[in-house]
């Protein structure tokens, strides 16, 4: 029994794909969803981050238990649209695939949750408790929307949280954090013909980087026991088991130097240079440890010439991989997906859960699970399989009913 036809479900997704929310303008999706919820007498509220960025919260049912369903409304930049086979901000159906920016990451998952909420309400299928939909702004960068909702207490009373990021057949109970660490070196600019009276910031930065590589290598040799196991995820993505050595490396802390800047012209000694790292913290080596790790190296080199800035700081998230929510989704999904394709794993990426759960994480059942192939995220010609999009609506409905009934 459904409220929406297949054609209507696809059109609802098409409507929000057309709303261009490239790292901004989520307010347009909020207004669209507010009108949709009003049509079905579902109470909702828009909470602004700023003039153009906002969240929307909608709720059905009452009392406990409370299941939160979440998805983000922002998408990454479409890049050069001439490189797309189909217009990125117009849903195109072709050979069983729905093309468009955000179809996989993650307007497909978000609209599946919205339809779930409406159909459960319209069909009076909620056995007990509350379902709270949290549609967020700014997940792709700083998680501003999730932080706002957490600060306002929207996660304080939840028992379970489903984040419908594209996971295919994977069900994730935990993930690493994500930190952006920028190290800046300062020196003294002079003409390059007299470098001895200046101070080359690049030299200081290289000294830092060489010591960083040495210390990081030593740390990885000690990093052998992990709470998070990401091996099942990699097996699914590459189609085979990865080696124990690779699994150990991937499940631990990782740090990558991804941006380097220094110098403005060839005949001047640079007075500033910087390195930017993306670090993926884990429970054993958390964000506080990472900050101290960088600062200690800076102190060893020269704290008068080096400084550390952390513009992005998201913590790792853990939960029980055998929780009621995980087992419920696994049981329900097995009726729609081949049993041997379903797996439970930790995730190497980060989600809004980092900002949502905070100190409350041990009390919440977490499942990151949604339609879409994660390898399609951020790609040109991004698409979601039509059957998967439609199928996951039914999975979300059944899993929500079962979880609230049995929790």
UniProtKB/Swiss-Prot annotation:
Binds 2 Zn(2+) or Co(2+) ions per subunit. One of its GO terms (biological process) is diaminopimelate biosynthetic process. It comes from the Bacteria. One of its GO terms (molecular function) is metal ion binding. It comes from Staphylococcus aureus (strain MSSA476). The keyword Metal-binding applies. The active site is at residues 74, 139. It holds the Pfam family Peptidase_M20. Belongs to the peptidase M20A family. Zn(2+) 2 binds at residues 105, 140, 378. The gene is dapE. The keyword Nuclease does not apply. PROSITE patterns: ARGE_DAPE_CPG2_1, ARGE_DAPE_CPG2_2. This is Probable succinyl-diaminopimelate desuccinylase.
């Amino acid at each position: 029994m459904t409220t929406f036809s297949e054609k209507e479900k696809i059109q609802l997704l098409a409507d929000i794909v057309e709303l261009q929310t490239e790292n901004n303008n989520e307010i347009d999706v909020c207004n669209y969803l507010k009108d949709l919820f009003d049509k079905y007498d579902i109470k909702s509220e828009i909470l602004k981050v700023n003039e153009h960025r906002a969240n929307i919260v909608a709720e059905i049912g009452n009392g406990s238990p409370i299941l939160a369903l979440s998805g983000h409304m922002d998408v990454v930049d479409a890049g050069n649209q001439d490189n797309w086979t189909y217009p990125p901000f117009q849903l195109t159906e072709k050979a069983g695939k729905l093309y468009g920016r955000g179809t996989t990451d993650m307007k497909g998952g978000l609209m599946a949750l919205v339809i779930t909420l409406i159909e459960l309400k319209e069909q009076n299928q909620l056995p007990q408790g509350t379902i709270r939909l949290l549609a967020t702004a700014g997940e792709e960068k700083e998680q501003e929307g999730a932080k706002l909702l957490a600060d306002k207490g929207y996660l304080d009373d939840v028992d379970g949280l489903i984040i419908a990021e594209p996971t295919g057949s994977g069900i994730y109970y935990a993930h690493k954090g994500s930190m952006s660490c920028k190290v800046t070196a300062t020196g003294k600019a002079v003409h390059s013909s007299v470098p001895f009276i200046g101070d080359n910031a690049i030299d200081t930065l290289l000294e830092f980087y060489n010591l960083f590589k040495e210390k990081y290598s030593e740390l990885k040799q000690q990093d052998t026991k992990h709470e998070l196991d990401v091996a099942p995820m990699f097996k699914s993505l590459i189609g085979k088991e990865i080696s124990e050595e690779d699994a150990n490396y991937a499940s631990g802390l990782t740090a990558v130097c991804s941006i380097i800047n220094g110098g403005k012209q060839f005949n001047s000694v640079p007075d500033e240079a910087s390195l930017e790292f993306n670090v993926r913290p884990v429970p054993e080596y958390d964000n506080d440890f990472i900050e101290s790790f960088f600062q200690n190296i800076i102190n060893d080199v020269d704290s008068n010439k080096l400084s550390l800035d952390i513009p992005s700081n998201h913590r790792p998230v853990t939960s029980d991989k055998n929780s009621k929510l995980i087992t419920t989704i696994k049981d329900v999904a097995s009726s729609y997906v081949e049993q041997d394709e379903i797996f439970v794993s930790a995730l190497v990426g980060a989600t809004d859960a980092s900002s949502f759960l905070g100190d409350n994480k041990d009390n919440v059942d977490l499942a990151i699970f949604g339609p879409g192939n994660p390898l399609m995220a951020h790609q040109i010609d991004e698409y979601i399989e039509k059957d998967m999009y439609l199928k996951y609506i039914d999975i979300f409905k059944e899993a929500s009913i079962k979880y609230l009934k049995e929790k």
